[in-house]
A protein has these predicted regions:
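Residue register of alpha-helical TPR repeats
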Residues: 4, 43-44, 83-86, 126-127, ...
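Structural signature of alpha-solenoid helical repeat junctions
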Residues: 1, 40-41, 61, 80-83, ...
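Amphipathic alpha-helical segments of tetratricopeptide repeats
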Residues: 27-32, 70-75, 109-117, 151-158
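Short coil/turn linkers that connect adjacent helices within long alpha-helical scaffolds
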Residues: 35-38, 75-79, 117-121, 158-162
Length: 183
C-alpha cells in the first residue's frame, strides 16, 4: 500500500471535480490500511479525510477521523513528533470549523515547540503562525495575533515566499496590525 500513490489518485479525483468520489476512495483506503495494520498510511489518510470532511461541512465524519487519528497517535506512540503536531494542526482546524476557535488556538500553540524542535521547515512553521494569527484575531487576542503575524512575516521575507502563500501572510499581517491599532 503506497501512501503517495493513494494521495496522488485522490488529488487527481479532486482536480477532476470528483470530490465525493475522492472522499469515498480515501475512506476505503484508510479502512483498508487499518485492517492491514499499516497505521502510518492510515494516519496520513485520516488526516486527509479530516480536511475533506471539514471542507464539505461534514463535521461528524471529521470528528470520527479525529478520534481515529488520536487512537493511531497513541498506538504508534508518536506524541511529540512532527507527525503528531501536523495531525494536531488538522484537529485544531476541526475545532475551529465547529465554532471553538479558543480550543483551536490552544492546540495550535502546542504545535509550535514541536515544529521548532523537529525542524519541520520554514514554510510549515510560517503556515502554523499564520493559523495562530487568524485564530487569535477571531478570539480577540490582538497581541497574540500581531506577535504571530510578525513571526510569519519574518519567515516569509527570509525564504522569499511568493504567490498565494505570501499574499495570505501579508493579508493576515495587515489585519493583525490594524486590529492592534484599533484597541
Amino acid at each position: 500500500m503506497d501512501t503517495n500513490a493513494i494521495l496522488k489518485r485522490a488529488d487527481e479525483l479532486f482536480d477532476d471535480d470528483r470530490a465525493q468520489e475522492a472522499g469515498a476512495y480515501l475512506e476505503k483506503m484508510a479502512e483498508q490500511a487499518v485492517s492491514e495494520e499499516r497505521y502510518g498510511t492510515a494516519m496520513s489518510l485520516f488526516n486527509e479525510l479530516t480536511g475533506y470532511y471539514r471542507n464539505t461541512g461534514n463535521l461528524d465524519a471529521a470528528w470520527r477521523c479525529v478520534d481515529e487519528i488520536v487512537r493511531l497517535l497513541d498506538l504508534l506512540d508518536l506524541w511529540g513528533t512532527a507527525d503528531a503536531a501536523t495531525a494536531m494542526l488538522n484537529i485544531a482546524t476541526v475545532y475551529k470549523a465547529a465554532g471553538d476557535p479558543a480550543a483551536a488556538l490552544a492546540i495550535y500553540k502546542k504545535c509550535e515547540p514541536v515544529f521548532i524542535s523537529e525542524n519541520v521547515g520554514d514554510r510549515r512553521l510560517a503556515g502554523l503562525y499564520n493559523n495562530i494569527c487568524v485564530t487569535a484575531l477571531e478570539t480577540g487576542r490582538r497581541d497574540d495575533a500581531l506577535y504571530y503575524a510578525e513571526k510569519a512575516w519574518r519567515i516569509a521575507e527570509r525564504v522569499h515566499m511568493d504567490g498565494e502563500s505570501l499574499e495570505l501572510v501579508r493579508k493576515n499581517y495587515n489585519a493583525a496590525k490594524q486590529a492592534a491599532v484599533n484597541v
